[in-house]
Amino acid sequence: MKYIGAHVSASGGVSNAPLNAKSIGADAFALFVKNQRQWSAKPLTKSEISSFKTNLKNANISLEHILPHNSYLINLGHPDPQQRKKSIDAFLDEIYRCDLLDLKMINFHPGSHLKEIDENICLSNISSSINYILENSSGIKLVIENTAGQGSNMGFKFEHLGYLVKNSCDKNRIGVCIDTCHLFCSGYDIRSKSAYEKTMDDFGKIVGFEFLSGMHLNDSKCDLASRKDRHESLGKGCIGWSGFENIMNDKRIDEIPLILETIDNSIWADEIIALRNLIKGN
């Protein structure tokens, strides 16, 4: 079964996120558990935690289908060890917040070399940071998101993701999230059936479907291999509906959260319906 939702607002408190997901007909969602553009935030109150759990139950959404996203400030590959430690500490704080909400996973961008160090050194930094976080936390799965390769961001090749997964110290707590816009803009085509199968077969061989823990479903304003991260509404970009039809009919992608981050939240409910209608037999 496919579980579809969107990255919904937690404005006014994280307890609002399940209600916002329910309002668009979602059975999965993503959220920020703190302000994504600030290093620190007020602690979650007992009242807010309780309200989140109550609203989640009322929305009838499983914890397994929630994919929180951590701060955009975090850079686990930072060339400066002190800045890297700042990112690690911020990551651990976000895990603590997720634990309070009983969340099972946290999604993150791997990191950036900032054009100051070699890509391989940056990957090694990211890997070491991931392992430190795994060793100093418990339970929650760390879900690495692929990137478009914009600027100096790592994670735009399956080989990057495969390296980080292979070198993680706890394979039960590591996963991968594929963002379709990032995938397409980093050079992996999914538009035709044959292109999709080639791309996903490569993913299976290099990373492994057993590590696929979620997807971000976004069309792209920019063309194949553009290395630019510009999301578009489904069917209105360079990927088109055919790519999403391929995803919705791939049984290897069942039972994980499929999250919209498309640019017009006023049509998220329509996009969710459209995605479900792409499933053959529906």
Curated annotation (Swiss-Prot):
What this protein catalyses is:
Endonucleolytic cleavage to 5'-phosphooligonucleotide end-products
**Main enzyme class:** hydrolase
Does the UniProt entry include the keyword Zinc? yes
Q: Does the keyword Hydrolase apply?
A: yes
- Per its UniProt record, what InterPro entries does this chain match? AP_endonuc_2, AP_endonuc_F2_Zn_BS, Xyl_isomerase-like_sf, Xyl_isomerase-like_TIM-brl
What cofactor does its activity depend on?
Zn(2+)
In this chain, Zn(2+) 1 is annotated as bound at 69, 109, 145
Q: Its Enzyme Commission number?
A: 3.1.21.2
One GO biological-process annotation of the entry reads:
base-excision repair
Which UniProt keywords are present, listed alphabetically?
DNA damage, DNA repair, Endonuclease, Hydrolase, Metal-binding, Nuclease, Zinc
Q: Which GO terms describe its molecular function?
A: deoxyribonuclease IV (phage-T4-induced) activity; DNA binding; DNA-(apurinic or apyrimidinic site) endonuclease activity; phosphoric diester hydrolase activity; zinc ion binding
Among Pfam families, the record links this protein to: AP_endonuc_2
SMART domains on file:
AP2Ec
Q: How is the cofactor bound here?
A: Binds 3 Zn(2+) ions.
Where Zn(2+) 3 is bound, by residue? 182, 229, 231
Q: Which cysteines are joined by disulfide bonds?
A: none
Residues annotated for Zn(2+) 2 binding in this entry: 145, 179, 216, 261
Role according to the record: Endonuclease IV plays a role in DNA repair. It cleaves phosphodiester bonds at apurinic or apyrimidinic (AP) sites, generating a 3'-hydroxyl group and a 5'-terminal sugar phosphate.
- Name the family: Belongs to the AP endonuclease 2 family.
Q: Could you identify this protein by its name?
A: Probable endonuclease 4
What organism does the record attribute this protein to? Campylobacter fetus subsp. fetus (strain 82-40)
Q: What is the lineage of its organism?
A: Bacteria, Pseudomonadati, Campylobacterota, Epsilonproteobacteria, Campylobacterales
What gene name is listed for this protein? nfo
